[in-house]
Protein backbone atom coordinates (compact mmCIF):
# COMPACT_ATOMS: atom_id res chain seq x y z
CA UNK A 1 0.00 0.00 0.00
CA UNK A 2 1.31 3.44 -0.91
CA UNK A 3 0.93 6.89 0.62
CA UNK A 4 2.21 10.38 0.01
CA UNK A 5 2.76 12.98 2.70
CA UNK A 6 5.16 15.91 2.81
CA UNK A 7 3.53 18.16 5.40
CA UNK A 8 6.29 18.10 8.04
CA UNK A 9 9.93 19.16 8.10
CA UNK A 10 11.23 15.61 8.57
CA UNK A 11 9.54 14.18 5.48
CA UNK A 12 11.59 11.36 3.91
CA UNK A 13 14.57 12.47 1.80
CA UNK A 14 13.24 16.02 1.94
CA UNK A 15 10.67 15.16 -0.73
CA UNK A 16 7.86 13.09 0.79
CA UNK A 17 6.99 9.93 2.71
CA UNK A 18 5.76 7.18 0.39
CA UNK A 19 6.23 3.87 2.26
CA UNK A 20 5.47 5.01 5.80
CA UNK A 21 5.69 8.27 7.67
CA UNK A 22 8.90 9.30 9.39
CA UNK A 23 6.49 10.36 12.14
CA UNK A 24 5.36 6.74 12.54
CA UNK A 25 2.20 7.11 10.46
CA UNK A 26 1.29 3.97 8.51
CA UNK A 27 0.03 4.20 4.91
CA UNK A 28 -3.40 3.12 6.17
CA UNK A 29 -3.53 6.02 8.63
CA UNK A 30 -2.12 8.50 6.09
CA UNK A 31 -4.72 7.52 3.50
CA UNK A 32 -7.60 7.72 5.96
CA UNK A 33 -6.42 11.20 6.93
CA UNK A 34 -6.45 12.17 3.25
CA UNK A 35 -10.01 10.87 2.93
CA UNK A 36 -11.07 12.70 6.09
CA UNK A 37 -9.73 15.95 4.64
CA UNK A 38 -11.60 15.22 1.39
CA UNK A 39 -14.85 14.84 3.34
CA UNK A 40 -14.09 17.99 5.35
CA UNK A 41 -13.71 20.03 2.17
CA UNK A 42 -17.14 18.86 1.02
CA UNK A 43 -18.70 19.80 4.35
CA UNK A 44 -17.05 23.22 4.06
CA UNK A 45 -18.58 23.79 0.61
CA UNK A 46 -22.07 23.04 1.91
CA UNK A 47 -21.71 25.01 5.13
CA UNK A 48 -20.31 27.97 3.24
CA UNK A 49 -23.37 27.94 1.00
CA UNK A 50 -25.66 27.75 4.02
CA UNK A 51 -23.75 30.59 5.70
CA UNK A 52 -24.59 32.94 2.82
CA UNK A 53 -28.22 32.98 3.92
CA UNK A 54 -27.58 32.75 7.64
CA UNK A 55 -28.15 29.02 8.09
CA UNK A 56 -24.64 27.71 8.78
CA UNK A 57 -24.26 24.71 11.06
CA UNK A 58 -22.40 25.10 14.36
CA UNK A 59 -21.98 21.31 14.36
CA UNK A 60 -20.19 21.59 11.01
CA UNK A 61 -17.96 24.38 12.32
CA UNK A 62 -16.78 22.18 15.19
CA UNK A 63 -16.44 19.04 13.10
CA UNK A 64 -14.25 20.86 10.59
CA UNK A 65 -11.70 22.28 13.00
CA UNK A 66 -11.56 19.08 15.02
CA UNK A 67 -11.04 16.93 11.91
CA UNK A 68 -8.35 19.27 10.62
CA UNK A 69 -6.57 19.10 13.98
CA UNK A 70 -6.74 15.29 13.81
CA UNK A 71 -4.59 15.35 10.66
CA UNK A 72 -1.80 17.53 12.07
CA UNK A 73 1.57 15.80 12.33
CA UNK A 74 1.84 13.52 15.39
CA UNK A 75 -1.75 14.09 16.53
CA UNK A 76 -3.63 10.91 15.65
CA UNK A 77 -2.30 7.48 14.71
CA UNK A 78 -5.53 5.57 15.36
CA UNK A 79 -6.97 4.43 12.03
CA UNK A 80 -10.24 3.31 13.62
CA UNK A 81 -10.93 6.68 15.24
CA UNK A 82 -10.22 8.42 11.92
CA UNK A 83 -12.58 6.05 10.10
CA UNK A 84 -15.29 6.87 12.63
CA UNK A 85 -14.73 10.57 11.97
CA UNK A 86 -15.07 9.93 8.22
CA UNK A 87 -18.39 8.14 8.79
CA UNK A 88 -19.67 10.98 10.97
CA UNK A 89 -18.47 13.47 8.38
CA UNK A 90 -20.36 11.71 5.60
CA UNK A 91 -23.53 11.74 7.71
CA UNK A 92 -23.05 15.44 8.45
CA UNK A 93 -22.41 16.20 4.79
CA UNK A 94 -25.61 14.37 3.82
CA UNK A 95 -27.57 16.36 6.35
CA UNK A 96 -26.18 19.65 5.02
CA UNK A 97 -26.79 18.62 1.40
CA UNK A 98 -30.49 18.19 2.18
CA UNK A 99 -30.63 21.86 3.18
CA UNK A 100 -28.97 23.51 0.19
CA UNK A 101 -28.33 22.83 -3.49
CA UNK A 102 -24.84 23.29 -4.94
CA UNK A 103 -24.61 23.78 -8.69
CA UNK A 104 -21.65 22.06 -10.35
CA UNK A 105 -20.74 20.52 -7.00
CA UNK A 106 -17.20 19.10 -6.76
CA UNK A 107 -16.49 15.44 -6.03
CA UNK A 108 -15.90 16.39 -2.39
CA UNK A 109 -19.62 17.17 -2.17
CA UNK A 110 -21.11 14.36 -4.23
CA UNK A 111 -19.11 11.30 -3.13
CA UNK A 112 -20.63 8.97 -0.58
CA UNK A 113 -19.18 5.55 0.08
CA UNK A 114 -19.19 2.91 2.75
CA UNK A 115 -16.16 1.68 4.66
CA UNK A 116 -15.37 -0.97 2.05
CA UNK A 117 -14.72 1.83 -0.46
CA UNK A 118 -12.68 4.12 1.79
CA UNK A 119 -9.24 2.80 0.91
CA UNK A 120 -9.80 2.86 -2.84
CA UNK A 121 -11.20 6.39 -2.75
CA UNK A 122 -8.41 7.62 -0.46
CA UNK A 123 -5.82 6.74 -3.12
CA UNK A 124 -7.35 9.38 -5.42
CA UNK A 125 -7.89 12.35 -3.09
CA UNK A 126 -4.50 13.02 -1.49
CA UNK A 127 -1.87 15.64 -2.21
CA UNK A 128 -1.03 14.24 -5.65
CA UNK A 129 -4.59 14.75 -6.91
CA UNK A 130 -3.30 18.10 -8.21
CA UNK A 131 -0.94 17.60 -11.14
CA UNK A 132 0.37 21.16 -11.55
CA UNK A 133 3.35 21.50 -9.18
CA UNK A 134 2.84 25.17 -8.34
CA UNK A 135 -0.92 24.90 -7.85
CA UNK A 136 -0.33 21.85 -5.64
CA UNK A 137 2.31 23.69 -3.63
CA UNK A 138 0.11 26.70 -2.97
CA UNK A 139 -2.94 24.57 -2.21
CA UNK A 140 -1.00 22.62 0.39
CA UNK A 141 0.54 25.79 1.84
CA UNK A 142 -3.00 27.07 2.45
CA UNK A 143 -4.16 23.63 3.62
CA UNK A 144 -1.40 23.38 6.20
CA UNK A 145 -1.95 26.94 7.33
CA UNK A 146 -5.64 26.17 7.86
CA UNK A 147 -4.71 23.03 9.81
CA UNK A 148 -2.50 25.07 12.12
CA UNK A 149 -5.23 27.66 12.50
CA UNK A 150 -7.70 24.89 13.39
CA UNK A 151 -5.53 23.86 16.34
CA UNK A 152 -5.61 27.38 17.77
CA UNK A 153 -9.34 27.69 17.07
CA UNK A 154 -10.03 24.45 18.96
CA UNK A 155 -8.07 25.54 22.04
CA UNK A 156 -9.96 28.84 22.14
CA UNK A 157 -13.27 27.04 21.58
CA UNK A 158 -12.58 24.80 24.57
CA UNK A 159 -12.36 27.97 26.67
CA UNK A 160 -15.62 29.35 25.31
CA UNK A 161 -14.22 31.63 22.60
CA UNK A 162 -15.29 31.40 18.99
CA UNK A 163 -15.22 33.80 16.07
CA UNK A 164 -17.71 33.22 13.23
CA UNK A 165 -15.47 35.23 10.90
CA UNK A 166 -12.61 32.75 11.40
CA UNK A 167 -14.96 29.78 10.86
CA UNK A 168 -16.27 31.42 7.70
CA UNK A 169 -12.79 32.05 6.32
CA UNK A 170 -11.55 28.54 7.06
CA UNK A 171 -14.50 27.06 5.23
CA UNK A 172 -14.21 29.52 2.35
CA UNK A 173 -10.54 28.56 1.97
CA UNK A 174 -11.31 24.83 2.09
CA UNK A 175 -14.03 25.32 -0.52
CA UNK A 176 -11.59 27.20 -2.75
CA UNK A 177 -9.20 24.24 -2.52
CA UNK A 178 -11.82 22.05 -4.24
CA UNK A 179 -11.63 24.20 -7.37
CA UNK A 180 -9.79 22.67 -10.30
CA UNK A 181 -9.74 26.02 -12.14
CA UNK A 182 -8.13 28.05 -9.36
CA UNK A 183 -5.12 30.11 -10.51
CA UNK A 184 -1.71 30.78 -9.00
CA UNK A 185 -2.62 34.42 -8.42
CA UNK A 186 -5.85 33.47 -6.65
CA UNK A 187 -3.96 31.03 -4.44
CA UNK A 188 -1.33 33.62 -3.54
CA UNK A 189 -4.13 35.97 -2.48
CA UNK A 190 -5.69 33.12 -0.48
CA UNK A 191 -2.34 32.39 1.17
CA UNK A 192 -1.99 35.99 2.35
CA UNK A 193 -5.58 35.98 3.61
CA UNK A 194 -4.81 32.79 5.53
CA UNK A 195 -1.99 34.64 7.29
CA UNK A 196 -4.30 37.53 8.21
CA UNK A 197 -6.84 35.17 9.72
CA UNK A 198 -4.02 33.31 11.44
CA UNK A 199 -3.25 36.53 13.31
CA UNK A 200 -6.91 36.72 14.36
CA UNK A 201 -6.90 33.09 15.52
CA UNK A 202 -3.76 33.57 17.61
CA UNK A 203 -5.11 36.82 19.07
CA UNK A 204 -8.34 35.04 20.00
CA UNK A 205 -6.44 32.22 21.72
CA UNK A 206 -4.27 34.73 23.57
CA UNK A 207 -7.42 36.44 24.83
CA UNK A 208 -8.99 33.11 25.79
CA UNK A 209 -5.91 31.95 27.69
CA UNK A 210 -5.22 35.21 29.51
CA UNK A 211 -8.86 35.89 30.42
CA UNK A 212 -9.12 32.45 32.02
CA UNK A 213 -5.69 32.04 33.54
CA UNK A 214 -4.25 35.56 33.85
CA UNK A 215 -1.29 36.98 31.99
CA UNK A 216 1.84 34.81 32.06
CA UNK A 217 4.36 36.12 34.55
CA UNK A 218 8.03 35.52 35.26
CA UNK A 219 8.14 32.05 36.80
CA UNK A 220 10.71 29.56 37.98
CA UNK A 221 9.87 25.99 37.00
CA UNK A 222 11.27 22.93 38.76
CA UNK A 223 12.77 20.35 36.37
CA UNK A 224 13.36 17.79 39.11
CA UNK A 225 10.81 15.48 40.73
CA UNK A 226 9.01 14.93 44.02
CA UNK A 227 8.39 11.66 45.84
CA UNK A 228 4.72 11.24 44.91
CA UNK A 229 3.03 9.37 42.05
CA UNK A 230 2.59 11.64 39.06
CA UNK A 231 0.70 12.20 35.82
CA UNK A 232 2.61 13.70 32.90
CA UNK A 233 0.63 16.04 30.65
CA UNK A 234 1.83 16.66 27.10
CA UNK A 235 0.41 18.78 24.30
CA UNK A 236 -1.08 22.26 24.38
CA UNK A 237 -4.62 22.25 25.79
CA UNK A 238 -4.73 24.33 28.98
CA UNK A 239 -8.38 23.47 29.69
CA UNK A 240 -7.43 19.80 29.95
CA UNK A 241 -4.61 20.38 32.42
CA UNK A 242 -6.78 22.75 34.46
CA UNK A 243 -9.50 20.13 34.85
CA UNK A 244 -6.95 17.45 35.68
CA UNK A 245 -5.39 19.71 38.31
CA UNK A 246 -8.80 20.29 39.87
CA UNK A 247 -9.66 16.59 39.89
CA UNK A 248 -6.31 15.58 41.44
CA UNK A 249 -6.17 18.28 44.09
CA UNK A 250 -5.75 16.70 47.51
CA UNK A 251 -5.19 13.19 46.14
CA UNK A 252 -1.44 13.06 46.71
CA UNK A 253 -0.84 12.81 42.97
CA UNK A 254 1.47 15.37 41.37
CA UNK A 255 0.98 16.79 37.88
CA UNK A 256 4.00 17.37 35.65
CA UNK A 257 4.14 19.14 32.32
CA UNK A 258 5.95 17.85 29.26
CA UNK A 259 7.29 19.67 26.19
CA UNK A 260 4.76 22.29 24.97
CA UNK A 261 2.75 22.12 28.21
CA UNK A 262 5.65 23.76 30.11
CA UNK A 263 4.06 27.26 29.87
CA UNK A 264 1.15 26.12 32.09
CA UNK A 265 3.55 27.03 34.92
CA UNK A 266 3.54 30.68 33.79
CA UNK A 267 -0.20 31.32 34.22
CA UNK A 268 -1.29 32.55 37.70
CA UNK A 269 -4.51 30.51 37.72
CA UNK A 270 -2.65 27.29 36.93
CA UNK A 271 0.56 27.77 38.91
CA UNK A 272 -1.53 28.30 42.05
CA UNK A 273 -2.04 24.53 42.27
CA UNK A 274 0.60 23.26 44.67
CA UNK A 275 0.65 19.82 43.05
CA UNK A 276 1.69 21.26 39.67
CA UNK A 277 5.09 19.88 40.48
CA UNK A 278 7.35 20.77 37.57
CA UNK A 279 8.31 20.06 33.98
CA UNK A 280 9.61 16.59 33.15
CA UNK A 281 11.93 16.07 30.23
CA UNK A 282 12.54 17.96 27.05
CA UNK A 283 11.04 18.36 23.60
CA UNK A 284 8.51 15.85 22.25
CA UNK A 285 10.92 13.73 20.23
CA UNK A 286 12.79 12.50 23.31
CA UNK A 287 9.69 10.88 24.80
CA UNK A 288 10.64 7.28 23.95
CA UNK A 289 13.43 7.45 26.52
CA UNK A 290 11.97 9.93 29.00
CA UNK A 291 8.56 8.28 29.36
CA UNK A 292 10.21 5.03 30.42
CA UNK A 293 11.51 6.66 33.61
CA UNK A 294 8.46 8.75 34.43
CA UNK A 295 6.67 5.65 35.80
CA UNK A 296 3.22 7.24 35.85
CA UNK A 297 0.54 7.66 33.18
CA UNK A 298 0.99 10.14 30.32
CA UNK A 299 -1.86 12.25 28.94
CA UNK A 300 -1.65 13.58 25.39
CA UNK A 301 -3.99 16.55 25.06
CA UNK A 302 -2.83 17.32 21.50
CA UNK A 303 0.12 16.45 19.30
CA UNK A 304 3.01 15.48 19.61
CA UNK A 305 2.75 11.70 19.97
CA UNK A 306 5.60 9.42 18.96
CA UNK A 307 4.31 5.84 18.62
CA UNK A 308 6.16 3.80 21.27
CA UNK A 309 8.46 0.93 20.44
CA UNK A 310 6.88 -2.56 20.64
CA UNK A 311 8.84 -3.30 23.82
CA UNK A 312 8.18 0.07 25.51
CA UNK A 313 7.24 -0.31 29.17
CA UNK A 314 5.00 2.77 29.09
CA UNK A 315 2.63 1.64 26.30
CA UNK A 316 -0.16 0.83 28.75
CA UNK A 317 0.33 4.17 30.50
CA UNK A 318 -0.63 6.32 27.49
CA UNK A 319 -3.94 8.20 27.46
CA UNK A 320 -5.22 10.40 24.65
CA UNK A 321 -8.01 12.96 24.44
CA UNK A 322 -9.36 15.63 22.11
CA UNK A 323 -8.18 15.23 18.51
CA UNK A 324 -5.42 12.80 19.46
CA UNK A 325 -5.39 9.05 19.07
CA UNK A 326 -3.08 6.05 19.29
CA UNK A 327 -4.09 2.45 18.79
CA UNK A 328 -3.93 0.64 22.12
CA UNK A 329 -4.10 3.82 24.20
CA UNK A 330 -7.03 4.69 26.46
CA UNK A 331 -9.11 7.59 25.15
CA UNK A 332 -10.61 10.16 27.55
CA UNK A 333 -13.99 11.18 26.06
CA UNK A 334 -15.06 14.73 25.30
CA UNK A 335 -16.98 16.96 27.73
CA UNK A 336 -20.74 16.52 27.81
CA UNK A 337 -23.56 18.74 29.04
CA UNK A 338 -21.16 21.45 30.19
CA UNK A 339 -19.35 19.12 32.58
CA UNK A 340 -15.61 18.51 32.88
CA UNK A 341 -13.84 15.64 31.19
CA UNK A 342 -13.75 12.62 33.47
CA UNK A 343 -10.11 11.89 34.27
CA UNK A 344 -10.88 9.31 36.97
CA UNK A 345 -9.41 6.39 35.00
CA UNK A 346 -6.00 8.05 34.62
CA UNK A 347 -6.07 9.24 38.25
CA UNK A 348 -6.75 5.70 39.48
CA UNK A 349 -3.94 4.45 37.26
CA UNK A 350 -1.54 6.99 38.77
CA UNK A 351 -2.32 5.75 42.29
CA UNK A 352 -0.85 2.36 41.34
CA UNK A 353 2.40 3.79 39.97
CA UNK A 354 5.78 4.57 41.47
CA UNK A 355 6.98 8.20 41.60
CA UNK A 356 8.93 9.45 38.59
CA UNK A 357 12.68 8.97 38.41
CA UNK A 358 14.63 12.22 38.22
CA UNK A 359 16.39 12.81 34.90
CA UNK A 360 17.35 16.42 35.66
CA UNK A 361 17.45 18.84 38.55
CA UNK A 362 17.29 22.58 38.95
CA UNK A 363 14.99 25.28 37.63
CA UNK A 364 14.30 27.12 34.41
CA UNK A 365 12.70 30.55 33.99
CA UNK A 366 9.92 31.59 31.62
CA UNK A 367 6.72 33.59 31.40
CA UNK A 368 7.85 36.42 29.13
CA UNK A 369 4.67 36.83 27.09
CA UNK A 370 3.71 40.27 25.82
CA UNK A 371 2.13 41.66 29.01
CA UNK A 372 5.17 40.71 31.10
CA UNK A 373 7.70 42.07 28.60
CA UNK A 374 5.72 45.27 28.09
CA UNK A 375 5.72 45.68 31.89
CA UNK A 376 9.52 45.61 31.60
CA UNK A 377 9.48 47.92 28.56
CA UNK A 378 11.35 50.80 30.20
CA UNK A 379 14.16 48.48 31.24
CA UNK A 380 14.32 46.85 27.80
CA UNK A 381 14.22 50.16 25.91
CA UNK A 382 16.95 51.62 28.11
CA UNK A 383 19.12 48.55 27.49
CA UNK A 384 18.67 48.98 23.73
CA UNK A 385 19.36 52.72 23.81
CA UNK A 386 22.47 52.28 25.95
CA UNK A 387 23.80 49.56 23.67
CA UNK A 388 23.60 46.88 26.37
CA UNK A 389 21.25 45.00 24.03
CA UNK A 390 22.49 45.12 20.45
CA UNK A 391 19.97 42.78 18.86
CA UNK A 392 17.05 40.45 19.52
CA UNK A 393 16.86 37.04 17.89
CA UNK A 394 13.43 35.48 17.50
CA UNK A 395 14.12 31.75 17.69
CA UNK A 396 10.55 30.54 18.11
CA UNK A 397 9.14 27.40 16.56
CA UNK A 398 9.47 23.66 16.82
CA UNK A 399 12.10 21.12 17.75
CA UNK A 400 12.64 17.80 16.01
CA UNK A 401 14.83 14.74 15.63
CA UNK A 402 17.18 15.79 12.84
CA UNK A 403 20.81 16.02 13.93
CA UNK A 404 21.13 19.27 12.01
CA UNK A 405 18.96 20.92 14.67
CA UNK A 406 22.04 21.05 16.88
CA UNK A 407 22.60 24.23 14.83
CA UNK A 408 20.16 26.03 17.14
CA UNK A 409 22.05 25.07 20.28
CA UNK A 410 25.33 26.14 18.72
CA UNK A 411 23.75 29.36 17.44
CA UNK A 412 22.47 30.26 20.92
CA UNK A 413 25.80 29.42 22.56
CA UNK A 414 27.78 31.53 20.10
CA UNK A 415 25.57 34.61 20.12
CA UNK A 416 27.40 37.59 21.66
CA UNK A 417 26.56 38.50 25.25
CA UNK A 418 24.79 41.69 24.13
CA UNK A 419 22.01 39.80 22.35
CA UNK A 420 18.67 38.44 23.61
CA UNK A 421 16.73 35.40 22.36
CA UNK A 422 12.93 35.69 22.14
CA UNK A 423 11.35 32.25 21.94
CA UNK A 424 8.07 30.34 21.99
CA UNK A 425 7.29 26.73 21.18
CA UNK A 426 9.37 23.62 21.79
CA UNK A 427 12.33 25.04 19.84
CA UNK A 428 13.32 26.50 23.22
CA UNK A 429 14.55 23.14 24.47
CA UNK A 430 17.64 23.47 22.29
CA UNK A 431 18.91 26.29 24.53
CA UNK A 432 16.63 27.11 27.47
CA UNK A 433 18.82 25.20 29.92
CA UNK A 434 22.11 26.76 28.78
CA UNK A 435 23.87 29.16 31.20
CA UNK A 436 23.45 32.20 28.94
CA UNK A 437 23.15 34.74 31.75
CA UNK A 438 21.35 38.06 31.65
CA UNK A 439 21.75 41.69 30.58
CA UNK A 440 21.14 44.12 33.43
CA UNK A 441 18.77 41.60 35.00
CA UNK A 442 17.01 40.74 31.74
CA UNK A 443 17.47 37.01 30.98
CA UNK A 444 19.08 36.38 27.61
CA UNK A 445 16.39 33.81 26.81
CA UNK A 446 12.87 35.21 27.09
CA UNK A 447 10.35 32.38 26.74
CA UNK A 448 6.87 33.61 25.83
CA UNK A 449 5.24 30.17 25.95
CA UNK A 450 3.73 27.73 23.46
CA UNK A 451 4.03 27.92 19.67
CA UNK A 452 0.84 30.02 19.47
CA UNK A 453 2.55 32.51 21.78
CA UNK A 454 4.63 33.56 18.80
CA UNK A 455 1.75 36.04 18.70
CA UNK A 456 3.23 37.54 21.88
CA UNK A 457 6.55 38.00 20.14
CA UNK A 458 4.80 39.88 17.34
CA UNK A 459 3.01 42.10 19.89
CA UNK A 460 6.35 42.80 21.59
CA UNK A 461 7.89 43.73 18.24
CA UNK A 462 5.01 46.07 17.41
CA UNK A 463 5.30 47.70 20.85
CA UNK A 464 9.02 48.28 20.33
CA UNK A 465 8.27 49.69 16.88
CA UNK A 466 5.87 52.15 18.51
CA UNK A 467 8.29 53.09 21.31
CA UNK A 468 11.14 53.74 18.90
CA UNK A 469 8.89 55.60 16.45
CA UNK A 470 9.72 53.37 13.50
CA UNK A 471 7.52 53.26 10.40
CA UNK A 472 8.57 49.75 9.41
CA UNK A 473 8.64 46.76 11.77
CA UNK A 474 11.64 45.49 9.82
CA UNK A 475 13.74 48.45 11.00
CA UNK A 476 13.83 47.02 14.53
CA UNK A 477 17.04 45.34 15.73
CA UNK A 478 15.30 41.94 15.46
CA UNK A 479 16.40 38.89 13.46
CA UNK A 480 13.95 36.04 12.81
CA UNK A 481 15.67 32.65 12.84
CA UNK A 482 12.79 30.21 13.19
CA UNK A 483 12.83 26.42 13.42
CA UNK A 484 9.76 24.75 11.94
CA UNK A 485 8.39 21.22 12.08
CA UNK A 486 4.63 20.99 11.54
CA UNK A 487 1.55 22.86 10.41
CA UNK A 488 1.17 25.20 13.38
CA UNK A 489 4.55 26.61 12.42
CA UNK A 490 3.13 27.19 8.93
CA UNK A 491 0.31 29.39 10.23
CA UNK A 492 2.78 31.24 12.48
CA UNK A 493 4.95 31.93 9.42
CA UNK A 494 1.98 33.12 7.35
CA UNK A 495 0.80 35.31 10.26
CA UNK A 496 4.22 36.96 10.56
CA UNK A 497 4.21 37.65 6.82
CA UNK A 498 0.73 39.15 7.16
CA UNK A 499 2.07 41.49 9.87
CA UNK A 500 4.72 42.71 7.44
CA UNK A 501 7.73 40.87 8.85
CA UNK A 502 10.36 40.14 6.20
CA UNK A 503 13.67 38.30 5.97
CA UNK A 504 12.52 35.37 8.09
CA UNK A 505 15.00 32.50 8.11
CA UNK A 506 13.50 29.01 8.28
CA UNK A 507 15.33 25.84 9.19
CA UNK A 508 16.75 23.37 9.42
CA UNK A 509 15.38 22.89 5.87
CA UNK A 510 12.79 24.71 3.81
CA UNK A 511 9.43 22.94 3.38
CA UNK A 512 9.31 20.12 0.83
CA UNK A 513 5.83 21.26 -0.19
CA UNK A 514 7.20 24.52 -1.61
CA UNK A 515 7.80 24.12 -5.34
CA UNK A 516 10.83 25.96 -6.79
CA UNK A 517 8.58 28.66 -8.24
CA UNK A 518 6.57 29.17 -5.04
CA UNK A 519 9.79 29.24 -3.04
CA UNK A 520 11.09 31.96 -5.35
CA UNK A 521 7.92 34.02 -4.85
CA UNK A 522 8.48 33.89 -1.08
CA UNK A 523 12.13 34.84 -1.51
CA UNK A 524 11.42 37.71 -3.91
CA UNK A 525 8.47 39.20 -2.03
CA UNK A 526 9.26 38.45 1.60
CA UNK A 527 12.98 37.72 1.77
CA UNK A 528 12.40 34.20 3.12
CA UNK A 529 15.71 32.38 3.54
CA UNK A 530 17.24 29.23 4.93
CA UNK A 531 20.18 28.72 7.28
CA UNK A 532 23.83 27.77 6.78
CA UNK A 533 26.21 27.38 9.74
CA UNK A 534 25.91 29.06 13.11
CA UNK A 535 29.14 31.01 12.59
CA UNK A 536 28.23 32.19 9.10
CA UNK A 537 24.70 33.16 10.07
CA UNK A 538 25.71 35.05 13.21
CA UNK A 539 28.27 37.01 11.21
CA UNK A 540 25.66 37.81 8.57
CA UNK A 541 22.90 38.74 11.02
CA UNK A 542 25.17 41.04 13.05
CA UNK A 543 26.78 42.73 10.06
UniProtKB/Swiss-Prot annotation:
Localization: Cytoplasm
Annotated positions of the Cysteine persulfide modification: 398
Top EC class for this record: oxidoreductase
Catalytic activity, as annotated: A + NH4(+) + H2O = hydroxylamine + AH2 + H(+)
EC number: 1.7.99.1
Necessary cofactors: [4Fe-4S] cluster; hybrid [4Fe-2O-2S] cluster
GO MF term set: 4 iron, 4 sulfur cluster binding; hydroxylamine reductase activity; metal ion binding; peroxidase activity
UniProt: [4Fe-4S] cluster binding residues: 5, 8, 17, 23
Keyword line: 4Fe-4S, Cytoplasm, Iron, Iron-sulfur, Metal-binding, Oxidoreductase
Any one GO biological process: response to hydrogen peroxide
Residue positions binding hybrid [4Fe-2O-2S] cluster: 236, 260, 304, 398, 426, 451, 486, 488
Cofactor note: Binds 1 [4Fe-4S] cluster.
Domain of life of the organism encoding this protein: Bacteria
Job of this protein: Catalyzes the reduction of hydroxylamine to form NH(3) and H(2)O.
Family statement: Belongs to the HCP family.
HAMAP family reported for this sequence: Hydroxylam_reduct (MF_00069)
Protein name stated in the entry: Hydroxylamine reductase
Source organism of the structure: Bacteroides fragilis (strain YCH46)
Amino acid sequence: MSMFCFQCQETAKGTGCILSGVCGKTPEVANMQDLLLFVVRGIAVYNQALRKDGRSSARADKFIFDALFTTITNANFDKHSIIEKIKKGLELKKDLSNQVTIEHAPDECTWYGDETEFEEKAQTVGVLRTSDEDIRSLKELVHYGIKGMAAYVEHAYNLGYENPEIFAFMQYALAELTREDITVDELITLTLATGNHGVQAMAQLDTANTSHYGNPEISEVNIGVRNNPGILVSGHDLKDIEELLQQTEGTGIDIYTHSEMLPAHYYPQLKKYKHLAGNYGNAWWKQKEEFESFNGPILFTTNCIVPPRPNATYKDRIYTTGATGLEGATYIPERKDGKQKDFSVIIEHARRCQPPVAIESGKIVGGFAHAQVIALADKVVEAVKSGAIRKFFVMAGCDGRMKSRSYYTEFAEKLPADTVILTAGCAKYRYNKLPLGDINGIPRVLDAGQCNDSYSLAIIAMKLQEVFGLKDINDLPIVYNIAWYEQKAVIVLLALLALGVKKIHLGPTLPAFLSPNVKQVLIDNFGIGGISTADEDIAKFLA
